[in-house]
Amino acid sequence: MIQAETSAADSAVFAGNRAQGAVRFDVRAVDGVTRRGQLHESGSLRVRFPSPEQQGLSAVLVNTAGGIAGGDRFGVDIAVGESARLTLTTAAAEKIYRSHGPAAQLDIALQVAEGGHLAWLPQETILFDQARVERRIDIDLAAGASLLLCESVIFGRSAMGETMRSGRFTDRWRLRIGGKLVFAETVRLDGDIGALLGRPAVAKGGVAIGTALIAPGDAALVARLREDADGFGAEVGITAWNGIAMARFCAQDAAKLRADMMAVLRRAAGRALPRLWLG
């Protein structure tokens, strides 16, 4: 465990420097075309819609603060209406900087109505040494909705010679389909994260991890996603249960992780990934 002592003056400085940001919007299908509904933005979080409103809508989240530090609070709340289709990514990888104070808070709420589809495809989250972050992802799908979701986390910037030795990473996921909880997971890494990642039962020395979740998902989808297995550079496990499919990734570097995740996501999506992933 990591303990940090701060004075009242230090706490006041931390509070004054904390960033906040929130994005809340919905999309809806109108005559077979997905259109934006209500939109709320605040603080340093923004959303842009770079493509024309065709059959499906694309959106890009932008953090104008340039990164996330201790005590920052960010929230995203997205609702996809009946028969609407939305693909969302981020403008760049998100960086979580070191903190000697409170953890950053990230809250993500995603709702998809009957016949709707959401592809939640943010780029990587990079944790610097001594970063402290707590993330919550809550997903609520109607019984006839579909989802393609990925998240990846890089511990340190190995290409820059930087490693993550200590910090805190808490990641809480909850997925409900038709009001029923079908997936619940909480990951907690606290203290000497470098040593934890070195354990064979944790990451076996890997510094880049990822998850792709597909709903609905079954054995046939798993077989299709495994077709690229011979070319994987990371350790990849793919399975299905409870009507969903999931792929787990663990790699020694971010480049291998991204390459393998892109291969799986392309097969799952049946189409090209957002152009920002290709840059």
Swiss-Prot record:
Subunit text: UreD, UreF and UreG form a complex that acts as a GTP-hydrolysis-dependent molecular chaperone, activating the urease apoprotein by helping to assemble the nickel containing metallocenter of UreC. The UreE protein probably delivers the nickel.
GO MF annotation terms: nickel cation binding
Keywords: Chaperone, Cytoplasm, Nickel insertion
Organism: Rhodopseudomonas palustris (strain HaA2)
Entry keyword Cytoplasm: yes
Family statement drawn from the similarity comment of this UniProt entry: Belongs to the UreD family.
InterPro entries recorded: UreD
Chaperone in keyword set: yes
Localization annotation: Cytoplasm
Lineage, uppermost ranks: Bacteria, Pseudomonadati, Pseudomonadota, Alphaproteobacteria, Hyphomicrobiales
GO CC terms in record: cytoplasm
Coiled-coil region(s): none
Pfam families per UniProt: UreD
Free-text function comment from the UniProt entry: Required for maturation of urease via the functional incorporation of the urease nickel metallocenter.
Domain of life where this protein originates: Bacteria
Gene: ureD
Identification of the protein by name: Urease accessory protein UreD
